[in-house]
Amino acid sequence: MLSTVSVFFMSIFVLLCFLGILANGFIVLMLSREWLWRGRLLPSDMILLSLGTSRFCQQCVGLVNSFYYSLHLVEYSRSLARQLISLHMDFLNSATFWFGTWLSVLFCIKIANFSHPAFLWLKWRFPALVPWLLLGSILVSFIVTLMFFWGNHTVYQAFLRRKFSGNTTFKEWNRRLEIDYFMPLKLVTTSIPCSLFLVSILLLINSLRRHSQRMQHNAHSLQDPNTQAHSRALKSLISFLVLYALSYVSMVIDATVVISSDNVWYWPWQIILYLCMSVHPFILITNNLKFRGTFRQLLLLARGFWVT
């Protein structure tokens, strides 16, 4: 029997996931419709479509995984369904991190203003590289998934054998594998996109600082369109940075700390794990004129439906 606190946080988790699924689904539908109509997408829309799709699938699979683990704790450890779910989750986690990184790089390249030849070359070439970067991210995620699958399959086979050297129990052996294999693998495979993400934001902050210094003697600097564009993008990226960092840290902690479903902190921890992919889509929608207009119309229609 779940406690009142657990039921409360479980309800928040379900609501958060459904809102994220709706927001990511909205982005995917909008961009898919545009792709069908025009036959092509802008580089930024390609990244947003990829990011929205991976997050949509990640939340659906994560929702199933959280409840399956909570309701069938004993069966979860020895079920083949765990390997299947982990296979999808590992791929989607890696792909989502990479797609989010390319989004931050695109922000930096489009808005930042540097005269370095390497940056100018990247600004010129990046739009054409986006499809290949997305395909490369999928390939890297597939390779990472295979490495995680090997570890998960080893755990499953060990659980069936129950034979270990010395007096080691399965729980102790599994714990050692988590620390010696899964955690280093997660750190290595996520540190590269996370580093690129941080570099992009730092470059954008530096560009904004330099632009502000050049415009500080201009009485209309606050109304300057470029300054306003920098400020809006910076606020969006800072919020993305906080959510991205929270997602990264929580994922690393999740690899080392196992919280059982009967623990009172299980559902609050699930909320933290899925917070970024649920909140950030709404930030993207509110900062995108095309998304914002359609989303506002849908909200008005929904409001009118419930009022009547």
From Swiss-Prot:
Q: Which Pfam families match?
A: TAS2R (PF05296)
Task: Give the CC-aspect GO terms.
Answer: membrane
Per the record, ranges on the Extracellular side are 1-6, 82-90, 150-184, 261-264
Q: Which residues lie on this side of the membrane: Cytoplasmic?
A: 28-60, 112-128, 206-239, 286-308
State which residue ranges cross the membrane: 7-27, 61-81, 91-111, 129-149, 185-205, 240-260, 265-285
Where is it predominantly found? membrane
Question: From the Swiss-Prot or TrEMBL record, what is one GO molecular function term?
Answer: taste receptor activity
Q: Which residues are glycosylated?
A: N152, N167
Q: Where in the cell is it found?
A: Membrane
Query: Record keywords: Manganese included?
Result: no
**Alphabetical UniProt keywords:** G-protein coupled receptor, Glycoprotein, Membrane, Receptor, Sensory transduction, Taste, Transducer, Transmembrane, Transmembrane helix
Q: In which tissues is it expressed?
A: Expressed in subsets of taste receptor cells of the tongue and palate epithelium and exclusively in gustducin-positive cells. Expressed in 15% taste bud cells in circumvallate and foliate papillae but only in 2% in fungiform papillae. Expressed in the duodenum, antrum and fundus (part of the stomach).
List the membrane topology term(s): Multi-pass membrane protein
Q: Looking at the keywords, is Glycoprotein present?
A: yes
User: So what does this one do?
Assistant: Receptor that may play a role in the perception of bitterness and is gustducin-linked. May play a role in sensing the chemical composition of the gastrointestinal content. The activity of this receptor may stimulate alpha gustducin, mediate PLC-beta-2 activation and lead to the gating of TRPM5.
Family matches, as PANTHER family: TASTE RECEPTOR TYPE 2 (PTHR11394), TASTE RECEPTOR TYPE 2 MEMBER 41 (PTHR11394:SF73)
| Extra remark | Most taste cells may be activated by a limited number of bitter compounds; individual taste cells can discriminate among bitter stimuli.
Family note:
Belongs to the G-protein coupled receptor T2R family.
**What is this protein's name?**
Taste receptor type 2 member 41
Source species: Rattus norvegicus (Rat)
